[in-house]
Structures are given as C-alpha cells and as structure tokens.
Regions:
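Short alpha-helical scaffolding segments that buttress acidic/His motifs in well-ordered protein cores
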Residues: 65-69, 140, 217-222
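Amphipathic alpha-helical blocks
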Residues: 75, 85-110
Length: 251
C-alpha cells in the first residue's frame, strides 16, 4: 500500500508507545495551545510565524498531534490505514516523513469523500476524510496556527473555536439584549465549507504566516482533491469538512 509521499506502508501490530513530552503544554477544551503565544509581543509572534515549520515539526508538537488523532479515532482515508496502525508506521517512517516536509517534497493524499444526507430532502453534507498521516500533519499545523490566529478573531465569533460553545454564544446574545439591542439578523452561508475561495484564504494566511514553507504545504492540502467511487475529483475551492485544519481555515 502506498502513502501520499511514496513510502510503502506495511501493517504492523505493536503495542502503543509514545516518547515522553518534555514539557506539558496548555490546552483549551482539548485543543493544544502554546503558552508562549498568548500575551506575547509582536516581535515574539513574528519569530514564531517566520520559523513556523520548525515549531510544527517539533517532537512535542507532533506527539501532541498524534495523541489528538488517536483520541478522536475516526475512520481511515484513501490509503486504508487505520488510526491504530499510525504509531507503528510513524516509528518506521517518521524521520523520512519529517524530512520530506522540511524539503517541501511531501504530497498529501486526496481525501475520501463521504456524503451525509441532510434533513432537507435531496441535500447532502460533503465530508472529506484525510488519511491518518495527513490527519496528523494537519493537526500539528492547526495546533501551531490556532493560538496565533485566535488573537485576530472577533470576540463575538463562537463557531469552531477552542473554549467557546453554543452556550457561550447564547450568553453573549443575552448580554446584547440586556444592553438594549433589539434586532437580530439570522442567516446561513450556504455550502460555506465547500465554497471557500483558495486564493483569498492563502492571501489572508500569508499576511501572518511569514514562513515560506508553510503556505505551500497548506495550499497542497487545499488542492489535494477527493476520491469518490474510485474516481478522483479535483478541488478548486472549499476546505473539506473532516480535516483538523479545516475549521481554522474556514474561520
């Protein structure tokens, strides 16, 4: 079986083992957050955005990403690898995988397209299930990007954000009502995840991310395509629902 980066994957059955993480990192609602980002100066933030790939590929960040993927479980992607097979694979191929990422040679797999019927007749929600290796890499990316971009998001935004829930949004609405606001606008961005403009997204990300190795990697994931019924479908727009980095990119 081939992975997206051309390495043959052999199914192995070894008891789970994970190297110790040197320092415990902060988490908010189960999402990994680097304490070094919050409350830091612009100079420090610029340092991390300029050297972002190095922090993404740090052992402690990859270990935390593996733990999150393992905890979430979920089904496998197009290469057939299951979550419980990921650790044995990483033991054998981690250095080669990290090397390909550093050199910009890594090629993500297409996502596995799954369609979930909506309540509205004839409508479906399109999910894109990444391979386990791609899920790990996306999770590692998301863990580093989240604390950086959280500082830029609106305080009145609650969707797909760590430490924020529907109940928090309701409390904010109640607060506005008590402050005298009397109008509510209700709207739905139809097929939002499926129609995110790639060029605009890359432009927005590039304003903050100054590491020229990270933007191309994210772009590869956006353009990786999808497999459905044995056929390849290119992705010219949208971020696939089902990948760890998609909620952050959508926001």
């Amino acid at each position: 079986m081939e992975t997206g980066h051309g390495i043959k994957y052999r199914q192995l059955h070894i008891e789970d083992y994970l190297q110790e993480i040197p320092a415990e990192q902060g988490r908010v609602s189960g999402v990994y957050v680097h304490e070094r980002i919050t409350g830091d100066t612009d100079t420090n933030t610029n340092f991390w955005t300029n050297n972002l790939l190095d922090t993404i590929l740090r052992s402690d960040n990859l270990n935390a990403a593996y733990k999150r993927v393992k905890a979430n479980n979920g089904s496998g992607g197009v290469d057939g690898m299951q979550v419980d097979e990921l650790l044995p694979y990483l033991r054998q191929h981690r250095d080669e995988l990290v090397g390909q990422l550093r050199r910009g040679k890594y090629k993500p797999n297409p996502v596995r397209r799954v369609e979930i019927p909506k309540e509205e007749k004839g409508k479906v929600r399109k999910l894109g299930i990444p391979s386990c290796v791609d899920r790990l890499i996306q999770q590692a990316i998301s863990q580093e990007l989240t604390p950086i971009f959280e500082e830029q998001f609106s305080d009145n935004s609650f969707g797909f954000r760590p430490g924020r829930s529907t109940h928090d949004a309701i409390k904010r609405c109640k607060q506005f009502a008590e402050e005298g606001y009397v109008y509510v606008v209700s709207m739905d961005l139809q097929a939002y995840f499926d129609t995110v403009n790639h060029s605009k997204l890359i432009e927005v990300l590039s304003r903050t991310i100054k590491d020229g190795r990270v933007i191309p990697l994210i772009h590869k994931y956006l353009k990786a395509g999808a497999m459905k019924d044995g056929g390849f479908h290119p992705t010219e727009e949208g971020v696939p629902q089902g990948g760890p980095q998609s909620p952050l990119c959508a926001n």
